[in-house]
Amino acid sequence: MRHARALILTSVSAVALLIAAPAFADALLSGTVKSADGKAMGGVTVSAKPDGGTITTSVFTDEAGKYYFPPLPAGHYRVWAQALSYQTAKGAADLSANAKQDFALAPMTDAEATFKQLPGNIVLDALPQRTPEEGRMKRIVRTVCTGCHTASFPLQHRFDEAGWSAIIELMKNANVYGSYVGGERKPSGILDYHQKELAAYLAAARGPGASDMRVKLPPRPSGEAARVVFKEYDVPLDPDANLPANFVQNDGSDWSLGTPSVLIPGWGVHDAWLDLAGNLWFTCNIPNKRTTIGHIDTATGEVKLFKVAGPNGLAAQTHGMTRDPNGIIWFNVNNGRGGLGRLDPATQEIKVYLPPTDMTQTGGAVTVDYDGKGNIWASAPDGALRFDPVAEKFTAYKSKTFKTPNGTGITYGTAADRDGNGYWAEMVLDTIGVGDGASGGVSEIKLAPDKVHGALVTADEMKFYETYNQPDFNNPLPWAQGPRRMGTDKFADVLWVGDSWGANLARIDTHTHAVKFVYLPGEQQPYHVAVDKNHDAWTNLWGADRVMRYDPNSNSWTAFDLPTRGAEPRYVSLLERPGKDTQVALPYFRARKVAVMTLRTQDEIDALAKQAAK
């Protein structure tokens, strides 16, 4: 542990780009969705977006096929309804007053068209696993081939064995950001070793001929999951790309178009929080000239961009963000050195604090959190940093285990508990670092390997893996747990870790460090974890277009499906205010939107139904 005062930068410029929507009087939109044979359809996603607007509102039908939007600004709206295996139904509504829009959904007649609609988790589930060999290949697809994108993007296409081999040839020379690094490092050993058999496996599943895949559609949302309302806020194209306003033809809103490409020019939306006034803030980790963090007015959709100067005329990049109990937004910022940014939403003033040059900097896949003593914690490549906002001092905590024959323990997620301790995930090494806030000591928690998938590895493969060095986060060993991002219960002594490859949440007692794995249904893969006031753990599934909530008391999961296909959320955060519905913020990295999901009670739905009937 090492302490040092921070260098403070106050000459931070705020460069704004304003994209505003006009405000009008509110009206109610409701209706009924039925199948082509006249039967009511529950759990159908119904979305509405005003002409020229940037906010898409989505709700779900109840068991009777009825849906009720919250009050919407007056205007002319595009309205559409969709469900897996059904064609997208499109309509329009004039909300100068309350309006109704009914739909009849026609079934898909083409299995390939249905497949194109699917989220990544259903695509992965459909991959064959009839033999141990198929099980090993499916494991590689589930981990290595989804390390930087959802499975629904590549697998919505069909290629023969040579085609899939060419794709693997490219991807084994790409890093976790999708950048080609063939001239800078050796190819990914795991893809290189398995290239021939993996290409054959993918060609059998998604080749030009008959497919070995068996798709099982899940039940549509019902109960609480069908009562929520989503507001999705478009983040604008980067003006410096000089593209027409209609450049993006697929943003994931119409599932029949498939999963969109991540190459949508715009601000990289990575982490997001609602401030205490209910407006959004998001981080940008994509190189650009205009924004470090962005602000979205949730009433109008107005976007305002704030720039901290970075190297070579670019904006300083950021990645992680948190909101402390006082409502202050903290984020990592790299202006040539890795530091912390502080923003007061009330004044929109930014200050940047930099560690001394001889101390480790913020870096890695940075996550930011606060502890119960008022300190801010952030990822550092080789451990974590703690920042004392009062003393304006940084303290460095170094990982005990860092470089190993199987890879380097670069920090991914970071979290802090109510006792003032910090935690960081060495994703490559299945290790959680622990920083003792009182003594400054460092310990570590080793996560047990995934024995089920480890047992599938052959003797020859095991010899290869004994010397295999993972070049990045997205090239894991078959038995890896993959601790990625995490969160603590601020009202208890529990750390929840999202194990992406193990498909579980690791529940860790912050006092005893005892570990218990809580598995997600269907091997769905968690990313980050946030804990609410009821001690429930929320996790965003970047490859499944959903967010899930785990109730430790009932040992039960609730899944909330997102309205956008290929959303790829990398973070989840909560806003819980007295007397108001819980809101969940979800930044869509692939689709370049930020969503707010609001939990609604049945009483609220009933009240809307009465108003709509007038």
Q: What name fits each language-model region?
A:
Residues 51-66:
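Short, acidic Ser/Thr/Gly-rich low-complexity loop/linker segments typical of extracellular
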Residues 84-101, 106:
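Structured interaction patches on ligand/partner-binding surfaces of diverse proteins
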